[in-house]
């Protein structure tokens, strides 16, 4: 999947610290730290902290 994120809160610091809080069955392709529950289907979110947000998903 292309890296995209609908919910991406950022801190007001410079540089900002942003985290994608979308939850889905997988994480986006650029995610380095993907955390998933053991449920079926799994609920995964990306734990990476970046200084930007990816474009919104369609």
UniProtKB/Swiss-Prot annotation:
Gene Ontology cellular-component terms for this entry are: extracellular region
Q: Which residues form a coiled coil?
A: none
Q: Which InterPro entries match?
A: Bowman-Birk_prot_inh, Prot_inh_BBI
UniProt GO MF annotations: serine-type endopeptidase inhibitor activity
Site, Reactive bond for trypsin: residue positions:
12-13, 38-39
Give the domain of life.
Eukaryota
Please provide the record's keywords in A-Z order.
Disulfide bond, Protease inhibitor, Serine protease inhibitor
Concerning what turns on (or off) its expression, the entry says: By wounding.
Q: Which cysteines are joined by disulfide bonds?
A: 4-57, 5-20, 8-53, 10-18, 27-34, 31-46, 36-44
Family designation: Belongs to the Bowman-Birk serine protease inhibitor family.
What this protein is called in its record is Bowman-Birk type wound-induced trypsin inhibitor
Give the source species: Medicago sativa
